[in-house]
Amino acid sequence: MRLISVTIIVFCLALPGAATAYGQQVGADLTRGQALVTKQCASCHAVGRTGASRHETAPAFRTLSQRYEIEALEEALAEGLSSGHPDMPEFVFEADDVGAIIAYLNSIQDR
């Protein structure tokens, strides 16, 4: 019985630290994802919660969930994102960057 009590106390003491670490990681992913899309995509797309895209046919990233399931974009980002549009360059991102981009895209969607 004493072992169970000690285990519960240790778990309860560790839980806030784990939540803080998780929150910091999520925040870091959002910041990195925002930086990546700003660098690679903002010359044509609106990449934030507001604003118009600079290229008239480039969708604002905050509206992507109206066309696509955001998580479904992971494979395209990792294997090479390309469209039939001649102005759209092909991009390939590393796995960690893909996760950060997806996290950022999810955070800005108009819902």
Language model segments and positions:
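N-terminal secretory signal peptides that target proteins for export/translocation
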Residues: M1-L3
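Bacterial N-terminal signal peptides
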Residues: S5-G17
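Electrostatic cytochrome c docking/interface patches
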Residues: G17-L36
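The canonical Cys-X-X-Cys-His
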Residues: G33, T38-V47, I101
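Protein kinase-like catalytic domain
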Residues: H45, N106-Q109
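Short, non-ligating residues that shape and space the ligands of small metal-coordination modules
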Residues: T50-G51, I70
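Short cysteine/histidine-rich zinc-coordinating motifs and their immediately flanking basic loops
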Residues: S53-A58
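Extracytoplasmic electron-transfer domains, predominantly the class I c-type cytochrome c fold
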Residues: A60-N106
